[in-house]
Amino acid sequence: SGFITLTRLTGDEITGTESTAGIIEKYFSLSQENTACLQDLSLGAGEMKVGDNYLCLHTLSDPEDLPSGVATDTRYERLSTDRSDCRLSFAAPIGILLTCNHVVNQYLFIDDSAENLRKFEQTARNMHSLSRYSRSNQINREWIEEYLNEAHSKGLTSIRAHCNVMAWSDDREKLKRIKNDVGSQLALMEAKPRHNTVDVPTLFWAAIPGNAGDFPAEESFYTFIEQALCLFIGETSYKDSLSPFGIRMVDRLTGKPVHLDISDLPMKNGTITNRNKFILGPSGSGKSFFTNHMVRQYYEQGTHVLLVDTGNSYQGLCNLIHARTHGEDGIYFTYEENDPIAFNPFYVEDGVFDIEKKESIKTLILTLWKRDDEPPTRAEEVALSNAVNLFLENIRRDNSIRPSFNTFYEFIRDEYQDILREKRTREKDFDVWGFLNVLEPYYRGGEYDFLLNSDKQLDLLNKRFIVFELDNIKDNKVLFPIVTIIIMETFINKMRKLKGIRKMILLEEAWKAISKEGMAEYLRYLFKTVRKFFGEAVVVTQEVEDIISSSIVKGTIINNSDCKILLDQRKYVNKFDEIQALLGLTDKERAQILSINMANNPSRKYKEVWVGLGGSQSAVYATEVSLEEYYCYTTEETEKLELMRLTEKLGGNIELAIKQLAESKREK
């Protein structure tokens, strides 16, 4: 079939090297670590020890112990719904669903099939001859005949097989529970649990990698290849990504931390062709919680993160970063009556205005000056371009000029008019007084004089964590377009100037508003080109209708997002066919997604999330964090208010407030 291949282990992989343990060393120490410590083996009355660990062995070595029927896979009810099947291998109960430390040893002995069948023919004849003396001989003959008929009619290969489960613990009491757990899991397969105490040393010896030749033949049973393969385990536990970059998630079954790279390693392997991400999760599914968890770890690994939000989801994290960096980072832009949002588009820290900075200033002035349905003439564009260039030249020459919109306005009013007069520029080509009149609300004393005249010398290029909170202005026809241009300019500036540094722009629900305000082309440009600048664009949405109704989402965002992240979709289970078709999900991926949060461990507090990479790799992980992280990310208003009050009480020390709040909750 090509789905399974065998790879011969090298000598170093078997016996190890000076720095890395081989598979034999790992087996003898019951460890998967590359620096395994060899343990003493000791045999006692009815028991065997490896180091401090006592072994417990269950075997499937007798046909009477086997299930009445086997299959390649079975439906796992706990993670299945009436609209989806979660399929696991038949032997999954002793594999990934058995949560203690254990090894499953499976043997297939490919003997001479024809010789085996001849022996069975002879045995059947003997049984027939002796059937008059014992009914059991007659019954055995019938079983052998049935085996032979199956082999000849279907052309099956006769083989011998064996399966055993070797578990261990350094605590005898715990080992008793483990023994019961293994027995219960075997019973789930409808097999008869057989706890083997006599043959433990022999079977342990035979299971040494490469030593199956010493396997005791009497411990095997005859079957066919097809049936024996049904005892193979098709699942594995979660493995850490072999990459220095990534985020920390959790194994959904065991709670074990997993290092997961969803950006660099998949790009290197060719699993994905871009780092963009599309995140879908209804309200309350833990969507913002997961994105907080993700961007914090990206930020801590050197990424420049720019977030556009409409719900204060990242306020706690931003405030924490702001406090930790003593105000150097964690910049939070939001609009409030007593503290309105303010920028200074004319300020750059290094004093260098490159072409893109000049173009962004011109675009900003044009947005203030002209309506969407009122394009500027060529003469107006030239006049404005000259005005911007001359003003920036004045700033470069004269350090006493403070760059701001106010000084730009005064330059147009007091100096640029004379220049236009000298050039004999006609009023109909550029109406300077009309221009000043339209821009007056943004000048000193005007209604929006705060907007472009910030006195904070803030260069966003070198700020690594920036949040634009647009909830209060997303419907404001004056403020919203200006802020979106600032956002656009900020990220493009980072994209082009920060060579070799990872950049991420994350658009929460704000993408809907942005896509309406002439920013649709920017989104298209962003998603198609950001990968060339070691960047990634992330869109987060919660409504299925948003995906279905938006041409930008369907045509640009989804098609250019090789990493898709979905949270609990049970709310949309009746609409999931549309989601599946739109995202191009396979039936297996559908089953994985609909299994999210179906069988959560009540003793742990976590939400599950599905991650799909390039349509070829996918898995469900858990977002499980400490109480400290929880209170940093929470979007529950009562919890946020509790944290804010404690922060104020502690003089603005949010980190200490988080620690105290988490500690108080643990003690309850």
Where are each of the predicted segments found?
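Glycine-rich, often proline-containing surface loops adjacent to acidic residues and nearby aromatics
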Residues: 154-167, 278, 463-467, 504
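Gly/lys/ser-thr-rich phosphate-binding loops in alpha/beta enzymes
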Residues: 70-96, 298-326
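Conserved P-loop NTPase motor cores
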Residues: 263-285, 289-297, 305-315, 331-339, ...
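A short, charged
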Residues: 279-303, 645-668
